[in-house]
Each structure stands twice: as structure tokens, then as C-alpha cells.
Amino acid sequence: MIKKTSGTEIRALARHIGMSAQKARRVIDQIRGCSYEQTLMILELMPYRACYPIFKLVYSAAANASHNRGLKEADLFISKAEVNEGVIVKRLKPRARGRSYPIKRPTCHITIVLSERPNFNFKNI
């Protein structure tokens, strides 16, 4: 995993995850804009195979935020989450009479960006 930071955003990137981008987007669309705790609950309860690598990536991004920036995990939310298509791993499956059929295994790249929620002070309003 490659981790990049810029400004107040914490970015985590997982590359070459062995699933199609369409199946990963189905999960990413559910967690975009949610808080960190709510995201972990959603990912634990969803029955899809894509949840586990996304769970690990969100957990890693939050650990980077608390360790490198000293941010509280309760104040974090997912400001940006995207899934891009990776390379297609091509294999050959042996078939009858010396033939072979191609097997195309898609991969994807998942990017999670965490930001800190702004704290509003209502005493000054």
C-alpha cells in the first residue's frame, strides 16, 4: 500500500486488488461520505468479498492519520473514495483436443481519502 499525505487529507492507496472494479465500487458507494466508525460498521456487516480489502485500507488510513498527524479517529470521515481499473491478468485454461481458453482476471486500484470534520463552535454564533 502506498500512502500519501497532502494538507489535512490522509490518503491511502491499494493497488492490484484481485477483483473487478465494478464489484469494489458497489461497496465504495455505500461508505463514501460516512464517518470512520460508521464505515467500519458498514464494512463488517456487508456480505461482499470486496469489503475486507476496503476495511483494511480504511483502517490503515485511520492509523496513518492518528500516528503521523495526531488526529482523533472519531473526527475522521471519508471525503473521497474511488476505484479505478487495474491491469487484467491473462491466463490460459486447458480444454479438450489441445485447445485453450483465455481467463481474464481483472484487478483494481482503490483510493481512500480521509479528512477531519470541521468543529463548529456554536458559542460564537
From Swiss-Prot:
Coarse class of the protein's main subcellular location: plastid
Q: What processes in GO biological process is this protein linked to?
A: translation
| rRNA processing recorded as keyword | no
Q: Which UniProt keywords apply?
A: Chloroplast, Plastid, Ribonucleoprotein, Ribosomal protein, RNA-binding, rRNA-binding
Role: This protein binds specifically to 23S rRNA. The globular domain of the protein is located near the polypeptide exit tunnel on the outside of the subunit, while an extended beta-hairpin is found that lines the wall of the exit tunnel in the center of the 70S ribosome.
Family membership noted in the UniProt record: Belongs to the universal ribosomal protein uL22 family.
- Protein's recorded name: Large ribosomal subunit protein uL22c
Source organism of the structure: Nymphaea alba (White water-lily)
